[in-house]
Amino acid sequence: MKKILILAVTVNLLCGSSFITAQNNIPSNLNISVLLDLSDRIDTIKYSNPSMEFYQRDLGYLKSVAKSFTSSMLTKRVMQLNDKIQLYFDPEPRNPEINELSNRLKFHVTKNNASLELFDKINKEYTTSALSIYKQALKDDVYVGSDTWGFFRNKVKDYCVEEGYRNILVILTDGYVYYKNNLLTEVNFSTYITPQTIRSKRLNQSNWKEIIETKKHGFIPLDLDLSNLEVLVLGINPVKNGNNKYDYDVLEKYWSDWLYGMGVKKENFAFKTAVLPANMDNIINSFISKKK
């Protein structure tokens, strides 16, 4: 018979945190969503990296996210457990096997199902099933891009934001945004940004910020209230050549202006390059545990 987890034995039962943390009035229940960019950024031929392939870095980040999620359960009373974690794509892959694997990464932990076995399963699935997703995507070798703008426009409120939760969206991407079936422009705003876009707008020079602010470049704004959402963007991998020296700065500016415009608070947004997972682990844990 499954053993119901008694978190941190008697100590946590007596001293566990309340639903709303006393120090910063932040809901204690987590609702973590992961948006996975399965564009050609994971291609091991086009973007090969001898130290560690980028999809392998993603896997390390996912492992840290899952570990931070399950570890947070150990700081709470059993009766308070009502926490969620799930993974999304946009567009959804045509391969049904990938979509089935993503269903294995959706968990809702409550007082009725909490157990050490469940926590182990969450950590295991975010390692094994996630690896299978990447292997299948690499095998299919069909990259149509990632519709990050469209995900925010059509899905983020329904999928990633719930009342009474700390809503955290972790986005694994190289920072560029491109989906061939959603290429819109409104004056100097667009639904996409690529290295070519940056060069064509002359944002690859030292006065890039002045150009963005005076000519109003950026992602097309969305009329959304995301003040109850925290966004952690991981895996930024700017093009490294003489014509794109400022890509990281431009990408961060595009993302931050866009998210702040939808109400995401500055302290609830982080934009991190694709460092090795061992160096990212503490960053992820600190963001999720709110140790900033």
Which residues make up each language-model segment?
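Extracytoplasmic/secreted cell-surface and envelope-processing proteins
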Residues: 42-46, 96-98, 178-182, 240-244, ...
